[in-house]
Amino acid sequence: MGSLLSSDSSKSAPASATPRTLERSGDSELPITSFDCSVCLEVLHQPVRTRCGHVFCRSCIATSIKNNNKWTCPYCRAYLPSEGVPATDIAKRMKSEYQNCAECGTLVCLSDMRAHIRTCEKYIDKYGPLLELGDTTARCVCPFCQRELDEDCLLDHCIIHHRSERRPVFCPLCHSRPDESPSTFNGSLIRHLQVSHTLFYDDFIDFDIIEEAIIRRVLDRSLLEYVNQSNTT
């Protein structure tokens, strides 16, 4: 099983459509395996799309890269310049798609399936408690006050304690990206973090920030390819 949905192959359900029930046998237009992560083999949780087009749980792709120490796709082994970006189209569809729990038969919204199987007695009796992959939170040092904290907390920390800072600093998160060198910012590090590193979500997604980040990465990659091509000619 594996989630092979890409941005080209998926179509969002109409907003006015009645939520559809997906049986385990699948739908010819939208096979149920499209919502399964090929790493944990469960319904996707916080789906992330890699550069090669495959979709995984956020924690699964992060843990796979961390444990293997290789920036490659767990499914096709293609090189990955980053962990990917939120598969917002998949996340939207999962909020309107329903499936019967394979163990107890309860009709559950796909976006809530992971929470359901954590408490599903029949699932627990058969497989044991759902085991999430290990904590993948990395640590970093605030470039302004040198305080060590979780990467996920850096943006909130800077907003609370360093909103007015304009000293040129290096972005500590760029160190962890294989295709990025440390960047110095004379302007707002907060804005850089929002655009370049705020890529995951909990209860909601800021689609404007995500779209801006994607556009910026595409433009940066296009410029880099143009420069490399110019240097070789």
UniProtKB/Swiss-Prot annotation:
E.C. numbers: 2.3.2.27
Keyword hit for Cell inner membrane: no
GO cellular component: cytosol; Golgi membrane; intracellular membrane-bounded organelle; VCP-NPL4-UFD1 AAA ATPase complex
Catalysis performed (reactions): S-ubiquitinyl-[E2 ubiquitin-conjugating enzyme]-L-cysteine + [acceptor protein]-L-lysine = [E2 ubiquitin-conjugating enzyme]-L-cysteine + N(6)-ubiquitinyl-[acceptor protein]-L-lysine
Post-translational modification: Autoubiquitinated, leading to its subsequent proteasomal degradation.
Lipidation positions, renumbered (N-myristoyl glycine): G2
Annotated Low complexity bias: 1-17
GO molecular function: p53 binding; ubiquitin conjugating enzyme binding; ubiquitin protein ligase activity; ubiquitin-protein transferase activity; zinc ion binding
Record flagged with keyword Transcription regulation: no
Broad class of enzyme this protein falls into: transferase
Residue ranges, annotated region (Linker region): 121-129
Annotated positions binding Zn(2+) 3: C101, C104, H116, C120
Zinc-finger ranges (C2HC RNF-type): 101-120
Amino acids binding Zn(2+) 1: C37, C40, C57, C60
Annotated region (Disordered), positions in chain: 1-27
Entry superkingdom: Eukaryota
Classification via PANTHER family: E3 UBIQUITIN-PROTEIN LIGASE RNF125, ZINC FINGER, RING/FYVE/PHD-TYPE
Role noted for this protein: E3 ubiquitin-protein ligase that mediates ubiquitination and subsequent proteasomal degradation of target proteins, such as RIGI, MAVS/IPS1, IFIH1/MDA5, JAK1 and p53/TP53. Acts as a negative regulator of type I interferon production by mediating ubiquitination of RIGI at 'Lys-181', leading to RIGI degradation. Mediates ubiquitination and subsequent degradation of p53/TP53. Mediates ubiquitination and subsequent degradation of JAK1. Acts as a positive regulator of T-cell activation.
UniProt comment concerning the protein's domains: The C2HC RNF-type zinc finger and the linker region stabilize the RING-type zinc finger, leading to promote binding of the RING-type zinc finger to the ubiquitin-conjugating enzyme E2 (donor ubiquitin).
Protein name, per record: E3 ubiquitin-protein ligase RNF125
Native species: Mus musculus
Name of the gene this protein is made from: Rnf125
